[in-house]
Amino acid sequence: MAADISESSGADCNGDPRNSAKLDADYPLRVLYCGVCSLPTEYCEYMPDVAKCRQWLEKNFPNEFAKLTVENSPKQEAGISEGQGTAGEEEEKKKQKRGGRGQIKQKKKTVPQKVTIAKIPRAKKKYVTRVCGLATFEIDLKEAQRFFAQKFSCGASVTGEDEIIIQGDFTDDIIDVIQEKWPEVVDDSIEDLGEVKK
């Protein structure tokens, strides 16, 4: 009678099925890791570059790829039969699932590479110099801000997404200083706007 009870359930003595071992699995388990994302192949679908992972799996392990596509096909058929169609699938791809890194955004270089320098009046006879566009040349704005503050012995701060404000009128010297420090910024790409109101 006791033997019947122990054989009938795969659970432990407390009745917890989580601690029971899989009966059809051979131990130690052999796990197949993806060559693209270095995770087990079951987790590739949660990575942002799923297409690359699937291509790698199809090329190197076609048997596993066939198993994976067979497992995923009932889910896709159920979604289409409910009337969602391809619009629902695209909407699902846009939303980030819980966990994971989300989609990796590609940098777009549509902004022209141009540095603009302007002198802005502050109070009475005081001015600040505004430098915009250094980020289009892949220049770290924090590093540039520290460099300007040290070079001109004044206060400098990063105020906008691509804007550095230097306390003082340095429009004459700053063009030469920028070209000395960052040679990739050529003379044609620097524009002096002169005195501009805030």
From Swiss-Prot:
Residues 1-11 have a biased composition (Polar residues). Residues 95-110 have a biased composition (Basic residues). The modification Phosphoserine is found at residues 20, 73, 189. Residues 1-20, 72-110 are annotated as: Disordered. GO terms for molecular function: mRNA binding; translation initiation factor activity. The keyword Lyase does not apply. Keywords: Acetylation, Cytoplasm, Initiation factor, Phosphoprotein, Protein biosynthesis. One of its GO terms (cellular component) is cytoplasm. Residues 115-182 form the SUI1 domain. The modification Phosphothreonine is found at residue 86. It comes from the Eukaryota. GO terms for biological process: formation of translation preinitiation complex; translation reinitiation. It holds the Pfam family SUI1. Interacts with MCTS1 (via PUA domain); the complex regulates translation reinitiation. Translation regulator forming a complex with MCTS1 to promote translation reinitiation. Translation reinitiation is the process where the small ribosomal subunit remains attached to the mRNA following termination of translation of a regulatory upstream ORF (uORF), and resume scanning on the same mRNA molecule to initiate translation of a downstream ORF, usually the main ORF (mORF). The MCTS1/DENR complex is pivotal to two linked mechanisms essential for translation reinitiation. This is Density-regulated protein.
